[in-house]
Amino acid sequence: MAPVAADSVLSTTDRRLVAALQWDGRLTAERAAKVLDLSPATVRRRLHALTADGTVRVVISPVARPRNGGSAGALFLRIRVLRGKLDTIVAALAAREDIPFIDVTTTGDEIFAVARTEPGSRDPLVFRQLPSTQAVTSLESATILHVFRLTSEWRHDVLRPAERAALSPAEPDPGPLAAGSPGPYGVDTDPLEQSLLDALTPDARLSAAALAARTGHPETTVRRRLAQLTLQGRLVTQVLVDPRRIGLPIEAKLLLHVAPDHLAAAGQALADHPAVHGAFATSGLSNLHAAAYFPDLAALYAFLSRDLVGLGITHVETALVGRAAKRTPPLGPVPPSPAVTRRRRPASAGQGKG
């Protein structure tokens, strides 16, 4: 990953605000000020500065953990290409809607990607299109079998235990499921809930008033449903920020061989590690995949030589990410949303015009 000038790393206050938003994406300035021992004016000013230029975005998580513990079925792809053909292959992959994440390693000829697919299906990308491309020299695919840690669940480790406890949400109350079509988290949604989630997807910090204006629903109804979604743990937000801006310029992909009787414990240990932002049990020779952020190479070495000891890991392959070629949603300012016109209610009987 390219070096970042020291002055581009966010201040301690800003990094603490980023971490607070990871715990509660809709955190108010007043509550953040109380928990972090800052003035509300400072919090409002810094949050505006961070979000106005796209340094930080809070979105509805595109990959959330369904209630049945799923999120399995997606494919990890490891693609090696001819030198000089990397950008062409990356561009072709990035154009596909079923590939939300693409990373290019520092070797300059290797791509890691995630492809959404149906479990057990013979995805044409893997079985026909990529293998027939002359620029591709090798292709490995592994199916996600179990999720230990999602990126939306990762928290930047800069808050004190008491602050984390104050910001941690209460244990979700499942409550009754809404009748409707499958929602983004593997549960059903009704039209009201789906319209709110759609409006919040690019900017999860929209106020209830703004949501009411965009969706055409009464503000009291919006507030009530938001509270219900939060209580049920279904309003899953994710903070988008370049990890280099929070002092973590090193990202590593880890492909691990773990003895079967240690797989569950090793996966959970990785999920609990503050550096790890993704951990999955997979098919293939490397049956545990992880992704982690580090402040420097010394920290990565300490992780490999100390933190992985005793987990039943028999082999580790480490790849450094040189460039995040695609993220869904992308980093940057919130895209403009089309205006939603509120439907006019028909005049009731006996109501005059004008």
Locate the predicted segments by residue.
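A compositional/biophysical signature of low hydrophobicity enriched in polar/charged and small residues
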Residues: 1-354
